[in-house]
C-alpha cells in the first residue's frame, strides 16, 4: 500500500521498517517536532529497526512478545513449559496427538522462533542471537521448520482467522499475540498463554511517514498523539502490548 501511494503514514512491523527505509519509501523524521519524544523508553529511541546512520525514520508505537497460546481444556492443569508442543510430534495431555492441531505463523519471524528453540535444545550449534544466524544455524532452523510442517494444520497470518480457528476449527496450540489471547479470553473461550522456558521472540511496531506524504503536518500531529499516555496505556491494555 505504501508503494502504491495515497497514504501519509504507516505503522510498520520490525521486519518491514528497514525495507521501507532501504527502498526510500519513508522519510527521515525530525524528532524535535515531536514534543513527547523524550517520554519514549530509551531502549527504543535509537532502535536499529527505525534508526539508520543516526537518522530516525519513525516513532516507536508498541512492542511485545510472541506468546504460546493454548487450549486449557486440552492441557488441563498442565501448563505447557516448552515450545516443543508445536515443534515436535507428541501426545498432548488430553491423550491425543498434536498433529494437525497446532498452528505456526506464516512470516520470517518464525525462522527466529525455530532458531530460539534450537538455541536452547541444541547449544552445540552456537546460536547466540536467533536473529543473527550463520549458514549452518540457518539451515538447522529451516530443517526444524520442515519437520514442523508435518504437524501444522494451518499457517496463520491474520489475527481474526486465528481467533476463528481456535474457536471453531479445533486448533489447540500456536505462537500468537496477546491481542488474540485477550479477545478469546474475553469471549469466554478456554484459552491461556505462556512464555515457555526457551523464551520468546518479539515484535516492535514503528509509525513512519511516507517520503511523499501530502499532509506532513498532520503526520507529525498523529505521531505526537500516539505517544500520549492515555492512548498508550489503553492500547497496551487492549492489545496486550508494552507502551513505548
Predicted features and spans:
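Generic alpha-helical structural context detector
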Residues: 113-117, 182, 224, 237
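Extracytoplasmic ligand-binding site segments that recognize negatively charged/polar headgroups
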Residues: 11-161
Amino acid at each position: 500500500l505504501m508503494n502504491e501511494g495515497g497514504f501519509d503514514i504507516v505503522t510498520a512491523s520490525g521486519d518491514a521498517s528497514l525495507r521501507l527505509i532501504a527502498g526510500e519509501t519513508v522519510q527521515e523524521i525530525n524528532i524535535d517536532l515531536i514534543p513527547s519524544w523524550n517520554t519514549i523508553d530509551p531502549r527504543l529511541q535509537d532502535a536499529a529497526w527505525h534508526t539508520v546512520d543516526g537518522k530516525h525514520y519513525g516513532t516507536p508505537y508498541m512492542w511485545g512478545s510472541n506468546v504460546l497460546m493454548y487450549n486449557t481444556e486440552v492441557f488441563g492443569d498442565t501448563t505447557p513449559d516448552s515450545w516443543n508442543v508445536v515443534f515436535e510430534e507428541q501426545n498432548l495431555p488430553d491423550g491425543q496427538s498434536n498433529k494437525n492441531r497446532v498452528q505456526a505463523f506464516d512470516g520470517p519471524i518464525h525462522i527466529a522462533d525455530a532458531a530460539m528453540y534450537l538455541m536452547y535444545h541444541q547449544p552445540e550449534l552456537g546460536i547466540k542471537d536467533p536473529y543473527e544466524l550463520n549458514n549452518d544455524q540457518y539451515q538447522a532452523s529451516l530443517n526444524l521448520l520442515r519437520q514442523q510442517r508435518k504437524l501444522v494444520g494451518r499457517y496463520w497470518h491474520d489475527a481474526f482467522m486465528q481467533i476463528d480457528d481456535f474457536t471453531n476449527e479445533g486448533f489447540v496450540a500456536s505462537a500468537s499475540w496477546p491481542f488474540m489471547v485477550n479477545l478469546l479470553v474475553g469471549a469466554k473461550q478456554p484459552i491461556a498463554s505462556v512464555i515457555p522456558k526457551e523464551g520468546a521472540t518479539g515484535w516492535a511496531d514503528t509509525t513512519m511517514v511516507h517520503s511523499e506524504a501530502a499532509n506532513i503536518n498532520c503526520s507529525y500531529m498523529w505521531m505526537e498523539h500516539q505517544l500520549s499516555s492515555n492512548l498508550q496505556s489503553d492500547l497496551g491494555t487492549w492489545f496486550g502490548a508494552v507502551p513505548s
